[in-house]
Amino acid sequence: MTGPLERLARRGLFLLDPETAHGVSIKALKSGVVPSCAAPADTRLEQVIAGLNFPNPLGMAAGYDKNAEVPEALLRLGFGFTEIGTVTPRPQAGNDKPRIFRLVEDEAVINRLGFNNDGHGAALARLQACSRQALIGVNIGANKDSADRIADYVAGIRTFYAVARYFTANISSPNTPGLRDLQARESLAALLSAVLAARDEEAAKTGRRVPVFLKIAPDLTEEGMDDIAAEVLAHNLDGLIVSNTTLARDGLRDQRQAKEAGGLSGRPLFEKSTAVLARMRKRLGPDVPIIGVGGVSSAETAAEKIRAGADLVQLYSCMVYEGPGLPGRIVRGLSQLCDRDKLASIREIRDSRLDYWAGRNV
């Protein structure tokens, strides 16, 4: 449950348009006004995934801290890791405003931001000032007007190699025309070959191998999932993030806002994204790391992502409604789940409801 101060802050922020409120929240984190809410360390929640030591399985998804302004402040809220971006080589303004919409009855958000960000240079300078111990991933994308989108992803690898703990290639935003075409098998093979070749070159030069993840959409056909899984396995990719926002509008209460174009996130995405997660786990087998994202709003929904096949989970939109205390509450709740079920590690529940979720028709 949120506390009275969080509820008051939320009411104040909801008087502002969503994009202004987002900017205010970034400034609040920068200033230190938002107190640390981290849960006590719990070895049962620790995991080594893709060679990285995660203190707990909960991360902040890309999209909130686009320009790497507050990664360490987010970690102090209780997240085990955070992901900045999506960043593109050149700064870009994104799509016209308004471009973020709250669906309050649904505890959802629709956005059509379009990779608005300050560009590689600005984000790099900020990350260079961060502790090297902070577990910060860098989500990379392509400029809207790029003549060579694959080259933009390669530039992201090279630019941020010294400061990224992991990379995410975002090919699944619905708000950059043609971007999701990179999920098609031939295009995906070319992208992964180029990105991983750049990573391997940087690893050879530095002696440090940075894992690369791929973030996919939930709006995939079975054939599309087959193709992505085949390329992930063929390229020995370090992991998958499932999923980005959806274009679907099924079952929403707020039909007025539901008509807005863009990607839907928040509570209504939970079932769809979790089913796709489980289907990808079935295709990839037990060893490829998967980060589950979409509709995580509580310790129980975070745990259910793990039961469906995730190693780690991320959230963003639900914090709009639950406040900055949410990550700490989720991490404490996962510790309580370990107590209740007498778990030596949170990993013990992974895949325990894989068949159920893989069979869901959503």
UniProtKB/Swiss-Prot annotation:
Q: Which reaction does it catalyse?
A: (S)-dihydroorotate + a quinone = orotate + a quinol
Keywords for this protein: Cell membrane, Flavoprotein, FMN, Membrane, Oxidoreductase, Pyrimidine biosynthesis
State the annotated membrane topology for this chain. Peripheral membrane protein
Catalytic residues as annotated in Swiss-Prot or TrEMBL: S173 (nucleophile)
Write out the GO biological process terms: 'de novo' pyrimidine nucleobase biosynthetic process; 'de novo' UMP biosynthetic process
- Top EC category: oxidoreductase
Its EC number(s): 1.3.5.2
Q: Which InterPro entries match?
A: Aldolase_TIM, DHO_dehydrogenase, Dihydroorotate_DH_2, Dihydroorotate_DH_cat, Dihydroorotate_DH_CS
Q: In the record's cofactor note, how is the cofactor described as bound? A: Binds 1 FMN per subunit.
The record's GO molecular-function terms, alphabetically, read: dihydroorotate dehydrogenase (quinone) activity
Give me the residues that bind FMN, please: A62, G63, Y64, D65, K66, T86, N139, N170, K215, S243, G266, G295, Y316, S317
State the needed cofactors, names only.
Answer: FMN
Q: Provide an example Pfam family for this protein.
A: DHO_dh
Q: Name one GO cellular component term.
A: plasma membrane
Residues holding substrate: K66, N111, R112, L113, G114, F115, N170, N175, N244, T245
**Location relative to the cell:** Cell membrane
Instruction: Identify the pathway.
Output: Pyrimidine metabolism; UMP biosynthesis via de novo pathway; orotate from (S)-dihydroorotate (quinone route): step 1/1
* Disulfide pairings: none
Question: Which NCBIfam families would you find in this protein's record?
Answer: PRK05286.1-2 (NF003645), PRK05286.2-5 (NF003652), pyrD_sub2 (TIGR01036)
Membership in a protein family = Belongs to the dihydroorotate dehydrogenase family. Type 2 subfamily.
Say what the protein does: Catalyzes the conversion of dihydroorotate to orotate with quinone as electron acceptor.
Please describe the quaternary structure of this protein.
Answer: Monomer.
| Official protein name in the record | Dihydroorotate dehydrogenase (quinone)
Encoding gene, per UniProt annotation:
pyrD
